UniProtKB/Swiss-Prot annotation:
Biased composition (Low complexity): 62-77, 588-600, 653-663, 1094-1104
NADP is among the record's keywords: no
Annotated S-S bridges: none
Free-text note regarding domains: Contains G-L-F-G repeats.
Name of the protein: Nucleoporin nup189
Gly residues: compositionally biased ranges: 78-90
A Pfam family assignment: Nucleoporin_FG
Name of the gene: nup189
GO molecular-function terms, A-Z: nuclear localization sequence binding; peptidase activity; RNA binding; structural constituent of nuclear pore
InterPro entries linked to this entry: Nucleoporin_FG_rpt (IPR025574), Nucleoporin_S59-like (IPR037665), Nup98_auto-Pept-S59_dom (IPR007230), Nup98_auto-Pept-S59_dom_sf (IPR036903), Nup98_C (IPR021967)
Species classification: Eukaryota, Fungi, Dikarya, Ascomycota, Taphrinomycotina
Length: 1807
């Protein structure tokens, strides 16, 4: 491939990039049987591509001369390029290395480009690219162990017999290096002494030269002169600090002002630049006689045949006296630009050609190949070699920059090449080869137009030409450097193709305009549209490897760079050239007035392009890029290079310095190369002021600038913005004027050029300096809310367009992109698991959750349907998006499915790191006692549409019913007034997706403003909302006006689609009246009644809701602060407006008459524009804009007082809802709370009761096993725990905080079975028992705090701080380990003695006192001091010393500040020797009372409503140590539970009061109905039991509710509540489980029958009711049922069977019924008479008739049913009495008048 015999690839054989060539030739070395030279060393017959172990490797083959080194097997002196020897390959063959292999000859003289190892022994085994290795390893100028004279690139040193190799840069070498080498005894250098440039330029070496002088400068602002009294202001010393200059003076021996050394550094002949004893580039060294200069100086006595980069002996191959490019000496080695070739058979070649300058050859060989007449195997140059078959007939051979070789020469300039040549054995007559750098061979169009093209210089337009000149008219130029032809568009991999058809001379002349190739060259292709010599901002299209070739003529030593946007590897030129460019060349680019931002290979992207050896740019504001060897800046403003001066000595000619002033880094975060080509505009000099001006005696008055002072941003060329900022101008609220009248750019980056000015008012001081208020441009959309904009459909949000302007055509900038980091987001089940699910299973995925590490998670409570997602991996990061403190599902507007579908289901959201922020430090506030922390928790409870669950450790957990965007913003938290926390008017912030609408008054927001969240039944129910903001600055007692109200016609609220103007138009946009807000009337400051609210528009009853949060119940209208919605980007504050008099509610009045006129004009125009007569209904339906109609106008002018309603989804977690004295529960799951007015609202609380208690059943089962059901003295069943009950199993069955509580309870109160010695006294046993309990408590506290302690320790910065934190957590062992690891032997010795002895503590205290006494305390580390304080037993305040303001003042440190209360209590327990739990608690309580502002109160973190609820752990400790009542322990919030979850506190109260009898409720009173020896009844105890039982029953666990109710102390309450509970839950009958539970609870059968009777009464089954009452032995109740319903119904219906069955249940039980005689007995006698049971006994029958007649008169018939039955029985008895002639009985019957008259007639007749 690279030199193989007839191989394919890059130039030989067949295959990849080259055509089949019959001639042998590879890319980097031809294969010839003659000793001809190749590019990288001659080729042997068996070499392969890259590094195979062959006899003749790639770059180390055994021919004579090559670019990268050759292997010399003979004694010839052919110079190689890289100094390689035989057996070496480029990429690491097993032989000698690539760039510095040894030569096997006895006296070789081949010099490598980077230095060669020449050795005549086998001791050297060179290694490639070593900078200064031992002998045998060559790099950049390494030594060899013998007298080899090869010169490295940077100079090599050959010391005979010395194996210590010097490094490459600046070391002494015996051969001539490119940048300077010295020989022994002759000294040569590369570019120094007597060559082209041999001068010594001054370098800063201290302050001697130039001497100090005062620097004066004219101030462009004031036309005055500023004087700078500083040496660093001098131009020569501006790049140095005082210390650097002082150090240089010291190094020169000038400690006292005496000037000495004046050594200077020149461009090509300076003192050592890299620190070597010899110069890197050829300094004149004393004592040298042979000085080889860069371009051919004389070396009279130089007989060393070592060659440098540019030739033997000297740089460019000459060895004569004072010649530029080579002399006629007999130098056998090859130079870079030409070799001195004699008629001898020395076949060594130069790097770029074989011939020398002084030979009589027809072709100039400076950059071409040799044309020897005597040798048919002469060496070839790098880029144009004579083929082995060349016999000298082709005299126009191609070199580096010119003619093509006449044969099948290899390399970069031959007629056959690797990268796209398409020739077959072209004749030798064509001279079509070109050079590497595209300088062009002279191509003749008259012959061989299809001549072969070469890889790196051929005449082709293929994709892989390295500088091809296309066929055109031959236009040779001098030296053959720049001959070009007209070329078509080159291929994609053109590495330097010339594009012009004009000649390109060698040394800087330009060419004329040429066609524009699209391709670019490796070393600089000309871009399209190149205009030579004019530099009229032509924009080339491509960039090359080494820099884009510009449109002007470019050549090696100077090219004119015009505006081409391409960037090169080593630098590029950019657009916006203001003047014609001079040529930039190899040794320096001269860019005139460019604004380039492209960087080079060796520099970061910067603003200018650096040349190889220097950079010359003009009129650059600031540049950071310089050439590799220094910058030569022409007329730059404060132009500096990266290396200070050039490597060759940078000369800065004609610089125009900027004023000396302080400056700020314009781009501290780097520069985006994407915008490096954009033009920038700098504000005029006249308006730029220095940030730090020189001191003057008095400020100079300035004239007013013609332009505004303030620009939006300095248009520096290195400033890149992704989006322009919208225009700002001072305008009225409803006025819409733009600052700039020019149209917006239509291209992606053109908008970056739009100059935007700020109003000067934006920078005027304000009272609140934290916030810059900019009057936002008010557009039509702002007024009419998403109306039609510019005649287009306003589907895109105007706010979004302002935040990120984009080209509507391509949409290249998306307004909201979320970068998904695969390692941040996670799903459960994972994507891998979900991908395995069938589609049916994806339709219902249970327990689905998505989260983002460090942000939060969302857990969906219902099964979700994931089958609708094309890519499941799009769910995290695109569908479910987590940002800081924000969670959004379906963030894209309109993508949300209806409620209940997809992911729009109820879920629990956890947001992390949601602490409140401090106003001063913006750090999170983690202290629960901080007022802002408490306010923050309150705010989280009040956020609408969220159900607060918990807030702990910065994690906010809440529940939502549907999805939108939920979260917090703390940008404006400093705006909150701490003194008005009770007057907060809500926390709801809403914004349309995906744009945030953030309030400037609060840090919380939430919205359900997502499609599908609340589906609308009609398209006309979306609201056009007007927002009010009360201006607190208005006077409170203003008689003639209400408060100023800021009106925000929000343009990004939801829009409605209005169709026909029918009755739906009456459902107008909701307007919040200032007179009635939040259900309060302003006149009387009382809540509005339901009658007031009944006049609301009907739209308010159909999912219509206000964006204004309901205020607190105590909030008066005068103090209301309705949150306005302001945009996140600029948080605009519109000009305030006022409402007029009371008769004009809602009338908008501006501050001045001009704005009022503008407002009127705009409103009039907008109303007319909104209702064009030709607009059809169809257009209205298709448009999403809201149109301003007459009704809206009337609403604006006169207001609407009856639009505010009570929203149906208002939750109970409102402020003032949970008022302990006015909040009552009912047994059926309802609650009643009374507000300040007489309004009483009943709401169901089922939704607020925790439905799931995963551990509750297990814990109750354990307690049931430990409970005994017994009969009390009254004979009623009751339950009580056994005295042997322990709570340790409860801790095992529970989790989280509850488990910690039960652990502590077990430690403190469970009976212990310690194995104590029996011989101890009872007192000693008690003391030992208490110590064991203390140790258990200590271990519990340590374990509880362990996670927190280790986390804090990891965050500690020093070992002392880490030790202190570990000690506060009682992690003594880890603290000792940390002290040992930090080698703090003193602490490692003291720490194990913690709490061991009082004497130890006293000694530590004495040490602290000694430090204070001797004033050593200021020098003691803070945490070391705190450690000693703990070891001394001090846990309160670490006392300081001195007085504030003194030098030795040390401030006192509160030890327990910012500590949790449990840690503070632990310090009392751990660091006080031999202290009990009670004593530790006493000390803690005393410290808490003494330092209330320092110590944290033991308050539960979930405490709300401003009520301090003590932590249950603290209460348990206090109950153990001091005793307490159970009232404090039985508040659910104290256990961090829901306010309606009583399980933990109920179980704890039952255990402590009944099982252990350790503490009890304080309200037990003696029941007068019980004996004196009975235990008094506690009402609080029964209330707690009823509350927990109600909770269980409401959650469906009514059987467990029965178990709880058995613990009621009051007998009647116990019986009634149990039967009631049974009755409510017998609807479906009793299952097997219920029966078993009832039996286990020993529920009496009578209670169960009573419950069944109650249920039968409920369903109207009176017969079963009577039956179960009789079964329950409740005969009184059964008799009542009989009289009221059952018996009358049976009599009326004649159902004797039913009546008989009902009466049978009373057999034998009538004696105890007082009312039976005149009740049930009547129906019994009636049944007997009806059935004729007394017919056999006439006497009994008559007795019964007389008895029933009397009883019927006494029967109390109250209802119609009873009266009807009585009438029927009376008539029946009357008939029997008439039959028996019982006149006395007839007179007693309660008969109607007609019956009574008939009886009277019969009696009269009988009488």
């Amino acid at each position: 491939m690279f030199g193989q015999n007839n191989s394919s690839g890059f130039g030989g054989g067949t295959g990849a990039f080259g055509q089949n060539n019959q001639q042998t030739g590879g890319l980097f070395g031809s294969n010839s049987n003659t000793p001809g030279n190749t590019l990288f060393g001659s080729q042997n017959t068996s070499t392969t591509g890259f590094g195979q172990n062959t006899t003749q490797p790639l770059f180390g083959s055994n021919t004579n001369g090559g670019l990268f080194g050759n292997r010399n097997n003979t004694t010839t002196t052919g110079g190689t390029g890289f100094g390689m020897s035989s057996g070496t390959g480029m990429f690491g063959q097993s032989n000698t290395p690539a760039f510095g292999g040894t030569n096997n000859a006895t006296n070789p003289s081949g010099g490598g480009l980077f230095g060669s190892n020449t050795a005549n022994n086998n001791a050297n085994t060179g290694t490639s690219f070593s900078f200064g290795s031992n002998a045998g390893s060559t790099g950049f100028g390494n030594t060899a162990s013998n007298t080899g004279t090869g010169g490295g690139l940077f100079g090599s040193q050959n010391n005979a017999g010395n194996t210590a190799g010097n490094t490459g840069f600046g070391s002494q070498g015996t051969g001539g290096g490119l940048f300077g080498s010295s020989t022994t005894p002759a000294t040569t250098n590369a570019f120094g002494t007597s060559g082209f440039v041999s001068s010594n330029a001054n370098a800063v070496n201290g302050t001697a030269n130039p001497p100090y002088a005062v620097t004066s400068e004219k101030d462009p602002q004031t036309n005055g002169t500023s004087v700078f009294q500083s040496i660093t202001c001098m131009p020569a010393y501006r790049s140095y600090s005082f210390e650097e200059l002082r150090l240089q003076d010291y190094n020169q021996g000038r400690r006292f002002g005496n000037a000495s050394s004046t050594n200077t550094t020149s461009a090509f002949g300076s003192t050592p630049a890299f620190g070597a004893s010899t110069t890197p580039f050829g300094q004149n060294l004393s004592g040298t006689t042979n000085n080889a200069t860069p371009f051919g100086t004389s070396n009279a006595t130089n007989t060393t045949p070592g060659s440098g980069l540019f030739g033997g002996g000297s740089a460019f191959g000459s060895n004569t006296t004072n010649t530029g490019f080579g002399s006629g000496t007999n130098n056998a080695s090859g130079g870079l630009f030409g070799q001195n070739n004699n008629t001898t058979s020395t076949p060594s070649t130069g790097l770029f050609g074989g011939s020398t300058f002084n030979q009589q050859k027809p072709a100039f060989s400076g950059f071409g190949s040799t044309t020897n007449t005597t040798n048919t195997g002469t060496g070839t140059g790098l880029f144009g070699s004579n083929n082995a078959t060349n016999t000298g007939t082709g005299q126009t051979t191609g070199g580096l920059f010119g003619g093509a070789a006449t044969g099948t020469g290899t390399g970069f300039g031959s007629s056959t090449g690797g990268f796209g040549s398409n020739t077959n054995n072209q004749p030798n007559s064509g001279t079509m080869g070109t050079g590497l750098f595209g300088f062009g061979a002279n191509n003749n169009t008259a012959n061989n137009n299809t001549a072969p093209t070469s890889t790196f210089g051929g005449n082709n337009s293929s994709n892989f030409s390295f500088g091809a000149n296309n066929n055109a008219a031959t236009k040779p130029s001098g030296f053959g450097f720049g001959s070009t032809t007209t070329t078509p568009a080159s291929g994609g991999f053109s590495f330097g193709q010339n594009a012009n058809n004009a000649p390109k001379p060698a040394f800087g002349s330009t060419a004329t305009t040429a066609p524009k190739p699209a391709g670019t060259g490796l070393f600089g292709g000309l871009g399209a549209g190149a205009n030579t010599n004019t530099a009229t901002n032509a924009t080339g299209t491509g960039g090359s490897l080494f820099g884009n070739a510009n449109t002007a003529g470019s050549n090696m030593f100077g090219s004119a760079n015009s505006s081409t946007p391409g960037t090169g590897l080593f630098g590029s030129t950019q657009t916006n050239n203001a003047t014609s460019n001079t040529g930039t060349g190899l040794f320096g680019s001269n860019n005139a007035n460019t604004t380039n931002t492209g960087g080079s290979l060796f520099n970061k992207p910067s603003t200018t392009t650096g040349g190889l050896f220097g950079n010359t740019t003009a009129q650059q504001p600031s540049t950071t890029t310089s050439g590799l060897f220094g910058a030569s800046n022409t007329n730059n403003q404060a132009q500096t290079s990266n290396f200070g001066t050039g490597l060759f000595g940078g000369s800065q000619a004609g610089q125009q310095q900027q004023p000396l002033q302080a400056s700020i880094d314009q781009n501290p975060y780097g520069n985006n190369p994407l915008f490096s080509s954009t033009t920038s505009q700098v504000a005029p000099t006249s308006i730029q002021e220095p940030i730090a001006s020189p001191l003057t005696s008095k400020p100079t008055p300035k004239k007013a600038a013609s332009l505004p002072q303030f620009w939006l941003s300095p248009r520096s060329h290195n400033t890149a913005r992704l989006a322009s900022i919208s225009s700002f101008a001072k305008s009225a609220v409803m006025n819409s004027t733009s600052a700039s009248g020019k149209p917006k750019s239509l291209h992606l980056f053109d908008s970056l050029n739009d100059d935007v000015l700020l109003s000067a008012d934006a920078f005027t001081p304000r009272q609140n300096i934290k916030k810059l208020v900019i009057t936002h441009k008010i557009s039509k959309d702002d007024i009419l809310q998403n109306g039609v904009k510019n005649g287009n459909d306003a589907k895109s949000d105007s706010k979004v367009q302002e935040k990120a302007p984009q080209n509507e055509a391509d949409g290249s900038l998306k307004k909201d992109e979320h970068v998904v980091l695969s390692d941040d987001y996670w799903m459960k089940p994972s994507i891998e698991e979900l991908s395995k699910y069938p589609k049916e299973k994806l339709c219902s995925v249970h327990q689905f959750s998505v989260g983002r590490t460090g942000y939060g998670q969302v857990a969906f409570l219902k099964p979700v349907d994931l089958s609708g997602f094309e890519k499941l991996e799009d769910i995290p990061g695109k569908v479910v998006v987590f940002e800081r403190k924000i969670c959004a599902v379906y963030p894209v507007e309109g993508s949300s499915p209806p409620l209940g579908e997809g992911l729009n289901v109820p879920a629990i959201i956890t947001l992390e790191k949601t602490w409140p922020l401090s106003r001063e430090t913006r750090e999170p506030i983690k202290d629960p006692q901080n007022p802002r922390y408490i306010q923050h928790v309150k705010r989280l409870h009040r956020i609408k549409d969220t159900e607060f669950i918990d807030f702990n450790d910065g994690k906010w957990i809440f529940k939502v019913q549907h999805f939108s965007r939920y979260g917090l913003l703390d940008d404006e938290e400093e705006e909150n007034d701490m003194s008005s926390t009770s007057n907060e008017a809500g926390n709801l912030k809403k914004y349309d997706q995906p744009n945030l609408k953030v309030s400037g008054k609060n840090d919380s927001f939430v919205t359900h403003h997502t499609p599908g969240a609340f589906p609308n039944d009609s398209k006309n129910k979306e609201l056009n909302r007007h927002f009010l903001k009360v201006d607190d600055s208005a006077p409170l007692d203003d008689t003639f006006m209400s408060k100023k109200v800021k009106l925000d016609f929000s343009s990004d609220s939801n829009v409605s689609e209005r169709g026909d103007y029918d009755d739906n138009a009456k459902k107008v946009d909701e307007v919040i009246s200032i007179e009635k807000v939040d259900g309060y009337s302003k006149e009387n400051n009382v809540p509005l009644s339901e009658d007031d609210l009944s006049n609301s528009s009907e739209s308010s009853n159909e999912s219509v809701y206000s964006l204004v949060e309901e205020s607190d119940a105590s909030l008066a209208a005068d103090n209301m602060d309705i949150e306005d919605i302001s945009e996140e980007s600029d948080r605009e504050e519109l000009s305030s407006m006022r409402f007029g008099a009371q008769d004009f509610h809602g009338l908008v009045v501006t501050d001045n008459w001009r704005d009022q006129l503008n407002l009127s004009v705009q409103r009039s125009a907008l109303i007319k524009a909104a209702f064009p007569e030709s607009q059809s209904n169809a257009n209205l339906k298709n448009s999403r804009g809201i149109y301003y109609n007459e009704h809206d106008l009337v609403t604006d002018i006169f207001g609407n007082q009856n639009l505010d309603t009570d929203r149906p989804w208002q939750s109970l977690d409102k402020p003032g809802a949970f008022i302990p004295s006015k909040f009552h529960f009912t047994a059926n799951g309802s609650c009643i709370y009374v507000l300040k007015s007489s309004d009483v609202k009943i709401r169901s609380i089922y939704d607020f009761i925790p439905t799931k208690d995963p551990n509750g059943t297990k814990l109750l089962e354990y307690q049931l096993d430990q409970t005994e059901v017994y009969l009390d003295l009254s004979g009623t069943h009751a339950a009580s725990p056994r005295s042997s009950m322990t709570v340790k199993p409860l801790s095992l069955c529970s989790s989280g905080y509850e488990s910690i509580v039960w652990d502590l309870t077990s430690i403190l109160f469970d009976p212990k079975n310690y194995s104590l010695p029996s011989e101890l006294s009872s007192e000693a046993r008690e003391v030992l028992y208490q110590k064991l309990v203390r140790e258990s408590l200590s271990e519990w506290i340590t374990k509880t705090l362990e996670h927190e302690t280790t986390t804090l320790a990891k965050e500690a910065e020093t070992s002392e701080e880490r030790i202190y934190i570990l000690l506060t957590g009682n992690l003594i062992g880890q603290a000792c380990e940390e002290a040992v690891q930090s080698q703090n032997n003193r602490l490692s010795t003291l720490i194990p003695l913690v709490n061991s002895d009082v004497d130890i503590q006293q000694e530590v205290k004495q040490q602290l006192e000694e430090w204070r006494k001797h004033g050593d305390l200021p020098f003691i580390n803070k945490f070391t001091r705190l450690i000693f304080e703990l070891l001394s037993g001090n846990t309160d305040i670490a006392e300081g010393c001195g007085t504030k303001g003194d030098e030795d003042y040390v401030q006192s440190i509160p030890i327990t500040k910012n500590m949790t209360w449990l840690r503070a209590f632990g310090l009392k327990l751990w660091y006080n020797t031999d202290i009990s739990i009670g004593e530790a608690m006493q000390l803690y309580v005393e410290s808490l009372q003494k330092f209330p502002e320092i110590m944290q109160k033991p308050i539960a973190t979930s405490a709300v409503q401003g009520i301090e609820v003590y932590d249950i752990i603290y209460l348990l400790l206090k109950a153990y140590a001091m005793g307490t009542s159970l009232e404090e322990l039985t508040i659910p919030e104290s256990a961090k539970c829901s306010p309606l979850n009583y399980r933990v506190v109920w179980q704890l109260a039952i255990y402590l009061s009944k099982a252990r009898s350790l503490c009890d409720f304080s309200d037990r009173v003696v029941d007068i109905n019980m004996a004196e020896d009975l235990k008094p009844i506690s009402v609080h105890s029964d209330q707690l039991t009823l509350a927990y039982a109600s909770q269980l029953e409401a959650s469906g666990q009514w059987l467990w509710s029965l178990f709880v109710l058995l613990h009621l102390e009051n007998v009647e309450t116990r019986t009634s509540t149990i039967t009631s509970c049974l009755a409510r839950n017998l609807r479906g009958g009793l299952g097997a489980g219920a029966v078993e539970m009832i039996e286990k609870l020993c529920i009496p059968e009578s209670w169960l029958n009573e419950a069944k009777a109650l249920y039968a009464r409920y369903v109207g089954d009176h017969l079963n009711e009577l039956y179960f009452l009789q079964e329950a032995a409740l005969y009184e109740d059964a008799h009542k049922v009989l009289l009221d319903t059952l018996a009358p119904q049976a009599v009326i219906s004649g159902n004797k069977t039913q009546l008989k069955k009902a009466l049978e249940g009373f057999n034998g039980q009538t004696d105890g019924l007082a009312s039976w005689r005149f009740g049930g007995q009547i129906y019994s006698d009636y049944l007997d008479l009806l059935e004729g049971n007394f017919d056999a006994n006439q006497e009994l029958k008559l007795f019964t008739l007389r008895k029933i007649s009397v009883a019927l008169k006494e029967l109390n018939a109250t209802n119609l049913l009873q009266k009807a039955a009585l009438h029927k029985i009376s008539r029946f008895v009357n008939a029997l009495c008439n039959e028996e002639s019982l006149t006395d009985a007839i007179c007693n019957l309660p008969l109607p008048l007609a019956d009574s008259l008939a009886n009277l007639q019969n009696i009269s007749v009988q009488f």
